[in-house]
């Protein structure tokens, strides 16, 4: 079980289609010559800019705001506590998550909701979920427009449902996601080939000059990392893997030593048994 958990951690985000092409964008602020720690919070318009400026290298890119746990209601009854993300229709092609039903472009519409297969089963049993109304926290109605395949537990960016930024802006009366001030979004990029990553990273500074005015005392650098690498570089992830690996090997060592000790402890009894058989006239082949 310990090694199974280690394997679970090491296989984070291997679920996505062609995971070697999927990358998380990291932003590093350089202020007064000092580099800050890279963070995964980015500008709301960054994915669209990357798609526009690097069409040959980038297959798709999307913005995700992760995540809120919300109570979902159907026909007045609380049905499920679910993790909901805010994104755009690019989310499925970028992450490589299979859409089972519905038109992906409808996710960008007001009050449209896409839900996972297991959430659809939980909410509506075997009934067709398309067109059904779901309430978020009993005060905001959304219409199910599509169903996507479940995202497994060992995924860094796991959600049960997703709705658009247009919907969130209407729900909270708050339009966000520009080039200034609100730098709190996850930017995921799917490259056409892994070798394109360094090319794009090298050209990011020139691209950003189109949108933000930097100076020698303050500017930003951008880099890319796979979701799996992002997960494994976290202190808590490394700690879990190290502790469980040490415990696992310790248990194996103790079990091995126990077997050796049991064998050694049985030697006197074995020798006594051999002696008795010898005294009784048994030959070597009969012992």
Q: Where do the PLM segments sit?
A:
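Juxtamembrane transmembrane-helix termini
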Residues: 7-17, 152, 261-264, 268
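Intracellular coupling helices
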Residues: 257-287
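N-terminal membrane-entry
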Residues: 234-251
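Exposed loop/turn and edge beta-strand positions of beta-sandwich/beta-sheet ligand-binding modules
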Residues: 109, 138, 183-185, 258, ...
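Structured, solvent-exposed hinge/loop segments at the ends of secondary-structure elements
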Residues: 2-130, 136-143, 202, 209-213
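Membrane-helix interface segments
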Residues: 57, 78-79, 196, 237-239, ...
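Mid-to-C-terminal secondary-structure elements
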Residues: 85-101, 113-237
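Hydrophobic alpha-helical transmembrane segments of multipass integral membrane proteins
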Residues: 2, 249-256
């Amino acid at each position: 079980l310990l090694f199974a958990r280690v394997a679970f951690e090491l296989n984070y985000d291997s679920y996505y289609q062609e995971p070697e092409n999927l990358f998380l964008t990291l932003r590093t602020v350089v202020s007064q010559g000092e580099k800050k720690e890279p963070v995964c919070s980015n500008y709301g318009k960054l994915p669209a800019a990357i798609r526009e400026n690097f069409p040959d290298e980038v297959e798709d890119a999307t913005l995700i705001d992760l995540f809120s746990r919300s109570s979902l209601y159907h026909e007045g009854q609380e049905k499920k506590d679910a993790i909901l993300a805010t994104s755009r229709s690019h989310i499925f092609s970028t992450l490589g998550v299979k859409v089972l039903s519905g038109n992906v472009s409808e996710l960008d519409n007001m009050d449209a909701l896409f839900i996972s297969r297991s959430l659809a089963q939980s909410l509506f049993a075997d009934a067709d979920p398309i067109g059904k109304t779901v309430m978020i926290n009993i005060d905001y109605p959304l219409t199910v427009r599509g169903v996507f395949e479940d995202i497994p537990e060992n995924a860094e960016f796991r959600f049960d449902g997703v709705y658009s930024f247009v919907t969130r802006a209407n729900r909270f009366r708050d339009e966000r996601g520009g080039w200034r001030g609100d730098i709190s979004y996850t930017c995921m990029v799917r490259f056409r080939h892994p070798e394109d990553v360094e090319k794009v990273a090298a050209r990011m500074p020139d691209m950003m000059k189109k949108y933000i005015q930097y100076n020698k005392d303050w500017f930003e650098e951008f880099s890319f990392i796979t979701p799996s690498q992002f997960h494994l570089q976290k202190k808590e992830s490394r700690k879990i893997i190290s502790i469980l690996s040490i415990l696992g090997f310790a248990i194996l060592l103790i079990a091995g030593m126990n077997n050796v000790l049991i064998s050694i402890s049985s030697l006197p009894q074995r020798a006594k048994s051999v002696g008795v058989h010898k005294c009784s006239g048994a030959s070597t082949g009969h012992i």
